[in-house]
Amino acid sequence: MGRDKDGNVAMHWAARGGNVALVRLLLSRNCPIDSQNDANETPLHWAMRAGTRGMAVVQLLVESGARANLYSRSYKRPLDVAAEGFRDQDNDDNDRALVAVDPQERRTTRWNMLRYSSQCRTLVLHHHECLDHMAKSHHDWEVPDRIDSIMSTLASRTFASCPPQDDSKFNSCEITVSNEFERATLELLSRIHSADYLAFVNELSKELDRKRKQQLLENVQNSNDSSEMSGGLSQEQHHIVPFTPMIQKKFIKEAKTKADGHSDTSFSAGSLKAARRAAGAVQHAVDWCVCLLESAVLLRVVLVGRNRNAFCVVRPPGHHAGINGLLSDAGSCGFCLFNNVAAGAMHALSDEKHRPRCERCAIVDIDAHHGNGTEEIVRKCHDSGRLLFFSVHLYDCDKPKKTNEFNYKFYPGTGADDDVPHNVINVPIAPLWREKEVIKSICTPTNGNGSAATERAQTRLKTKADSRVSSSTDLKSMSGNNEQQIGDELQNAFAAKPKSQLPTSSPHYPPHYLMGVGRLAYRRAIQHRLLPALRAFNPDLIIMSTGFDAARGDVGNARHYVNGTQAMGLDLEPEDYAWTSRKICEVADICCNGRVVSVLEGGYGRTPPSIPPPPLAEPTSSEEVRQPLEKGFFSECAMHHLKGLVDPYAE
């Protein structure tokens, strides 16, 4: 088989020129369809590089058995180089026009391939049983409408044929939406939770189900007596009970428990099924992203995923659920029943006949709250060297606790330090309500230069326009030049300070103040703490605890006061979630063939602008909210996150 100086065969050149007849002829002569050149690129890579002129060849190659999951030396699949041209191949003037990638041509070329290669699509999992976990009222934070808002927004933006110039929409060939998966088994849940906790939840569910059925029967009888056939259950008749106080009494053995009216976490007759279905979604996603498929063309078993990655749109969330559900120092279950991501990780690390074993799994938690339950499970894992837990979160706790009283100022008040022996990396971020203290911690009052540098930096972009960046924000400038410039200024400010004034040596300035506040601090945590750690750990699978409660205006990252005011702790934009997804997917392409499973955690919505913020009894409660939260921005963040999973290399 003849090759040119770069290792290309005739099939590469035929694909590059979009010559369908020649490609068909070469296939009839048994020319290798997946022959790789010196850059490890196949003819399918080259057909995709050619843009629209190679679309017919892409269809022919895929239908003839070309492997769409092969990576080049730059860790890209054919789908990832759509319409990029051949800028590094030669000096052909005809191909120079392709150096600047046309976004519309790129999307058109991608959609063409995705129509014939379903394994490159993103899997979106949801299930109606997740709606049966009922909250105390429709105006609570963690409600079924969270799932409905995401799925309805996705449905309204998904089209079989959408214009390539509109990058806010999804083509139906980019995603596979499914509700065909089983509930998590008791055996799987027993790997992460204690037998006593599982038995308690099961008995509670049976008791509430008996009451629900009895109530239905009484309703039917009353309807017959009054000749009104209503028969359904009202919100008050669902027998919803406060969950946190029950766990405190059963497992924590506390004399003083959370008041029932202040319990954010509820349990209803449908909660157990919903929680098992949520964990089952992650289990299913792991199996579909890491599996064995029989290739009839190659006559061998190859390691590929049926989907490139997955997004589990499920509830109740789980990252606060520890071995016994509630952790002794948490004060609240944080809306969580079973730890979905931990269940998925343990399933991935187990031996399964139908798929290869994952030797290492990384859990990345980007929720505004520390994943204390996940950390506890990872710490207790019998082989923690196979697990990595990373969490970036808000942290505000002035002093260590000296009593049993909860004195944290932002739930759950944990996650201040790393635990290197157990592969736990915590990156706490100071909330925006501490911004003045953060600025002061890196200021040098006696040094004008240091103060000026800090004034320019301030760890997040100074102006209101920058702190309220719209969807037109240039992500590259945000994560590149701007961040580098501000980082340099901060470093100069630190260098100018006397050693005695460094935050690490002062009890008034905690070490995590060095990260700064807001969006820039968050991006620094991802860029400089997460990505190097992921690359070094080299996982076979990455599972994301994806909470959207760090978004600007979300009640989940706010500090609520009894006078009705609230102070926001983070200000992430939808673009930040897309950027995070893409960065993690880029590392996943290097380490684990792009295997990423994202699982919905927090994110609740905003207080409607026409309604003043309601007074809350404590920072973690939502019982006083009188109107449903506005979920448009929450859904927008979810859509951008999904966009990052669907197309990690979008410009």
What are these regions (language model features)?
Residues 5-6, 12-16, 21-29:
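Alpha-helical adaptor scaffolds
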Residues 13-19, 46-54, 81-86:
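Ankyrin repeat A-helix N-terminal signature
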Residues 21-22, 56-57, 90, 94, ...:
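Conserved ankyrin/ankyrin-like repeat signature
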Residues 24-32, 59-67:
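Ankyrin repeat domain, specifically the short helix-to-loop turn at the C-terminus of the second helix
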Residues 62, 68-103:
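Leucine-rich solenoid repeat scaffolds
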Residues 99-364, 368-651:
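HDAC/HDAC-like amidohydrolase catalytic core signature
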